[in-house]
Regions:
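Pocket-lining segment of extracytoplasmic ligand-binding domains
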Residues: 11-103
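Secondary-structure end/capping motifs
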Residues: 72-143
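Conserved C-terminal helix/tail region of periplasmic/extracytoplasmic solute-binding proteins
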Residues: 142-161
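Helix N-cap/coil-helix junction residues
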Residues: 3, 108, 149-150
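Short beta-strand-to-loop elements that line the ligand-binding cleft
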Residues: 3-12
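Short, well-ordered coil/turn elements that cap or connect secondary structure elements
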Residues: 2-4, 39-40
Length: 161
C-alpha cells in the first residue's frame, strides 16, 4: 500500500505540529486527533479505519489487544480479562464520570470531542470482541506474517469462562 519509507518516531501528540511545520511529510494520527485533525490544520490522505473496513469486508478494526504470557496460567489470564471487561462496563454505565476522568488527559480538547472519542471505544466490542473481532485479529496477523512483519506463531485468543 505505502511501501518503504524513512520514518520518524515521536509522541502521538506532536504529530500534527510536525506535519504542519514540515518536519515530516505525513503522520499517523491516533486518539482524539482522528476527529480533530482538520481543526489542527492538517488534511487526511488515508483513513486507516476506512481502508481496513474495505479490505476486511467490514470486520472491526483490531486497534489493540491485551497480550499475556501463557506462564501466567489460564485462571489469572481470565481474571485479568474479567477485570478489564468490568472496568469498561463501569465506564459505559457511568459516562459522565468516565468523561471527567478522560478530560484529565484530553490535551485541551473540548468535552464534546472527548465524549465522541470515548463513545467510539467504550462499547460492546471493547468488552467482548466476539467472532468478528477474532476474525479481524487473525486477519491482521495473517497479513503481517505474509509481509514478514512478524514471525510465524500460533495465535491463541482467550475465551471467557
Amino acid at each position: 500500500m505505502i511501501g518503504k519509507f524513512d520514518y520518524v518516531e515521536m509522541n502521538f501528540s506532536d504529530i500534527p505540529e510536525a506535519v504542519r511545520s514540515g518536519k515530516v511529510d505525513v503522520g499517523l494520527v491516533i486518539h482524539e486527533t482522528q476527529l480533530s485533525f482538520g481543526e489542527e490544520g492538517i488534511q487526511k490522505i488515508l483513513d486507516v479505519g476506512e481502508w481496513w473496513h474495505e479490505i476486511s469486508e467490514g470486520l472491526p478494526v483490531p486497534l489493540g489487544v491485551n497480550v499475556m504470557s501463557e506462564k501466567l496460567g489460564e485462571d489469572l489470564i481470565h481474571k485479568f480479562d474479567l477485570y478489564l471487561q468490568e472496568s469498561i462496563k463501569f465506564a459505559r454505565d457511568n459516562i459522565p464520570d468516565a468523561l471527567d476522568y478522560a478530560m484529565k488527559y484530553s490535551r485541551g480538547k473540548s468535552r464534546e470531542l472527548i465524549e465522541k472519542f470515548v463513545l467510539m471505544y467504550v462499547n460492546e466490542v471493547t468488552v467482548d470482541m466476539g467472532e468478528a473481532g477474532e476474525k479481524a485479529v487473525k486477519l491482521m496477523f495473517d497479513m503481517a506474517k505474509e509481509k514478514g512483519l512478524v514471525p510465524d506463531f500460533e495465535l491463541k485468543i482467550s475465551k471467557p469462562l
